[in-house]
């Protein structure tokens, strides 16, 4: 855990609020300096998965593609790449199977929280690496398609709105 932020001022700061629920998309984050960070943070790299340990029902699991510091309310999980594909593990941590497992431990009323041993206690189905890699490639393609479709939907809505304004406005 890092407590002295000298040299880290320009690093992205990923708070739990910067991780979109269900998708893990990183949104609205700022730098360590911009946020005026004073409490301890964890260093993460593109090799890590960021798993939110508070309010596990929100299913906040991010796969960053940059280096930064994350909230102490998250676990930066470093994947052993010789036995597990990072994208495969990330999607498993977002799965209903894992969510059902982890919610059974979430026993605090005001701010549900899970501990590291509970996360590590999950028995992950681990197919051969080539199958995990195929899965990760497929998921990346699906994500690219989703982005392209969303862009088309946004453009179509914009066109529709402008036509409505032109004809009925």
Question: Language-model features: where?
Answer:
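Sequence-specific dsDNA recognition surfaces
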Residues: 1-4, 11-46, 65
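Generic structural signal for secondary-structure transition and capping sites
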Residues: 1-2, 98, 161
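Amphipathic alpha-helical coiled-coil/heptad-repeat segments
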Residues: 121-169
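A short glycine-rich beta-alpha junction/loop motif
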Residues: 54, 68-75, 107-133
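A short beta-sheet element
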Residues: 40-42, 46-94, 98
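Short, solvent-exposed loop/turn positions at domain surfaces
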Residues: 37-38, 108, 147
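Hydrophobic residues in beta-strands and at strand termini
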Residues: 16, 63-64, 79, 124-126
């Amino acid at each position: 855990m890092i407590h002295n932020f000298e040299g880290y001022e320009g690093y992205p700061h990923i708070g739990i609020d910067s991780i979109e629920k269900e998708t893990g998309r990183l949104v609205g984050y700022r730098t360590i300096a911009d946020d005026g960070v004073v409490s301890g943070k964890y260093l993460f790299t593109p090799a890590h998965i960021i798993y939110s340990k508070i309010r596990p029902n929100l299913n906040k699991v991010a796969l960053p593609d940059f280096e930064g510091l994350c909230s102490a309310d998250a676990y930066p999980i470093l994947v052993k790449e010789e036995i597990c594909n990072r994208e495969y593990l990330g999607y498993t941590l977002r799965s209903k199977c894992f969510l059902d497992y982890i919610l059974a431990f979430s026993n605090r009323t005001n701010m549900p929280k899970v501990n590291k041993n509970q996360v590590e206690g999950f028995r992950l189905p681990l197919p051969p690496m080539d199958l995990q890699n195929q899965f990760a490639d497929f998921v990346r393609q699906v994500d690219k398609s989703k982005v392209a479709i969303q862009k088309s939907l946004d453009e179509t809505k914009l066109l529709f709105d402008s036509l409505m304004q032109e004809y009925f406005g």
